[in-house]
C-alpha cells in the first residue's frame, strides 16, 4: 500500500539524540511544522546500515539548511542505538536522532516491516510540514541508498509545495524550469 499523500499514523517512541547525548520521546506531533526525513534500516551493528547512516550524516548540513529534521529508525531499542553510537566510527559521527522501534509500531505504520525477520526494510520517507508523506524509496536488503539524491528530492518537494500547479520533471534541480501541466503541454514534451 502506498503512503504517498497520506498522513503518518500516530506513534510514541524513545530515541537517542547524539547531539545532546540523551534519550528523548518522539511522537508524530514532532514531525508537524517542518520537513522531515525518516530513514528505516534493518539493524544496528550490521554492515550496509552504517554506510547508509554515515552517508546521510554527510548530507545533514544541507538538510538542516533546508529546514529538514532527520530521523533514523530500526527495530532496535534506543539503548542499542546509544551503544552503537559509542562503538562505531561511522555511527559516532551522527547528529540526528535515532528512534528505537522494538514494538515495530512505526515500522508497521510505514509498511516497511519484514514480517519474517522482524526487521525494518531499507525505506526512506520525505514528510511535509503537515505530516503527509511526499516521497518514499524502499530498497532490497543488499542495496544501500545514496543520500545525495535525497537532497534534490526534498528541494523538489518544497518547490512543488510553494508553487501549486507546477511540477518538477526528471533531473530537476533548484533554479531550473518546472512544468505547468495543461492542455497546451500535451504531446509537446
Curated annotation (Swiss-Prot):
Residues 2-159 form the Thioredoxin domain. It comes from the Bacteria. It is found in: Cytoplasm. It catalyses: a hydroperoxide + NADH + H(+) = an alcohol + NAD(+) + H2O. Its main location: cytoplasm. The keyword Disulfide bond applies. Coiled coil: none annotated. One of its GO terms (cellular component) is cytosol. Keywords: Antioxidant, Cytoplasm, Disulfide bond, Oxidoreductase, Peroxidase, Redox-active center. This is Alkyl hydroperoxide reductase C. Homodimer; disulfide-linked, upon oxidation. 5 homodimers assemble to form a ring-like decamer. The gene is ahpC. Thiol-specific peroxidase that catalyzes the reduction of hydrogen peroxide and organic hydroperoxides to water and alcohols, respectively. Plays a role in cell protection against oxidative stress by detoxifying peroxides. One of its GO terms (biological process) is cellular response to stress. Pfam families: 1-cysPrx_C (PF10417), AhpC-TSA (PF00578). GO terms for molecular function: NADH-dependent peroxiredoxin activity; thioredoxin peroxidase activity. It comes from Staphylococcus epidermidis (strain ATCC 12228 / FDA PCI 1200). Belongs to the peroxiredoxin family. AhpC/Prx1 subfamily.
